[in-house]
Each structure stands twice: as structure tokens, then as C-alpha cells.
């Protein structure tokens, strides 16, 4: 336990957030003035590992695209790890993420597509069989 705590202190803790929460934090900075937009962006730049979940749930507006591209590009330049989770096919992800983000992810580790059925569906259907599919 002490080793884990020391590692987290030395390396910095990972940060998990949903993509939509990232934009809620940015929008809150305009109203609450607790932090500037730059400070919010920096808070997503700093972690040694940033995990963005539910990537497909964002609005895909120009503002969101530019902001995500800026964050991913800053992290790319800093050589820090970013994991994006999206319930999308690889093709749809490329389309929604845009070339810049997709290229950065391919260059720094790749994109893994998992083809098994939704686990959420299994929770509502107790008679569902085994999960089939895999990751490539």
C-alpha cells in the first residue's frame, strides 16, 4: 500500500471523467469564475493518465472539437497517456473524433475496437448467452 501511495504521489494520480463532464466544467468556469477556462484545460492536461469515458455522448460542436483537440494535443506534446472510451465502431469514432485526435491516438498507442455486445443489455436480459466478440 505504501508503494502504491508513493507511486501515485510521485507520478500523479490518473483522472477519470466523462467527456460531457469535461464540457460541464468548462461551462461552469464561465459562470462561477472559480477557475478560468485555461485552468480547467490545464486540469485535464496535468494527470499522467487521463481517461475520457462516454466519448460518444458529447455534442460534437465546433467548440467541443477544438477544445478536445487542444487537450489531446497538449497531452501528446507532454507525452502523457490518454485513454478514450467510446461505444462506437472504429469508423464512427474516426468520424466523430476527427483526423487530428484519431492520428494522435494512433501514434501513441493505437485504437482498440471491441466487438462484444453491450454489457448493459445483459443486465436487463438474464437469459442472454455468453459474451462473444473480442478486441482488435
Regions found by a protein language model. Give the residues of each.
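Walker A/P-loop nucleotide-binding motif
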Residues: 1
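Short basic/glycine-enriched coil/helix segment immediately N-terminal to the Walker B
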Residues: 39-48
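The start of beta-strands in P-loop NTPase/AAA+ ATPase cores
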Residues: 13, 48-49
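Active-site loop/turn elements of alpha/beta-hydrolase fold enzymes
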Residues: 19
Amino acid at each position: 500500500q505504501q508503494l502504491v501511495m508513493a507511486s501515485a504521489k510521485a507520478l500523479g494520480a490518473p483522472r477519470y471523467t466523462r467527456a460531457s463532464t469535461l464540457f460541464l466544467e468548462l461551462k461552469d468556469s464561465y459562470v462561477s469564475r472559480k477557475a478560468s477556462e485555461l485552468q480547467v484545460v490545464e486540469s485535464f492536461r496535468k494527470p499522467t493518465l487521463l481517461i475520457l469515458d462516454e466519448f460518444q455522448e458529447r455534442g460534437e460542436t465546433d467548440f467541443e472539437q477544438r477544445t478536445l483537440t487542444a487537450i489531446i494535443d497538449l497531452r501528446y506534446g507532454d507525452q502523457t497517456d490518454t485513454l478514450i472510451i467510446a461505444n462506437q465502431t472504429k469508423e464512427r469514432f474516426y468520424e466523430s473524433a476527427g483526423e487530428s485526435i484519431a492520428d494522435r491516438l494512433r501514434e501513441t498507442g493505437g485504437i482498440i475496437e471491441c466487438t462484444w455486445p453491450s454489457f448493459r443489455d445483459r443486465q436487463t436480459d438474464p437469459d442472454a448467452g455468453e459474451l462473444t466478440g473480442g478486441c482488435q
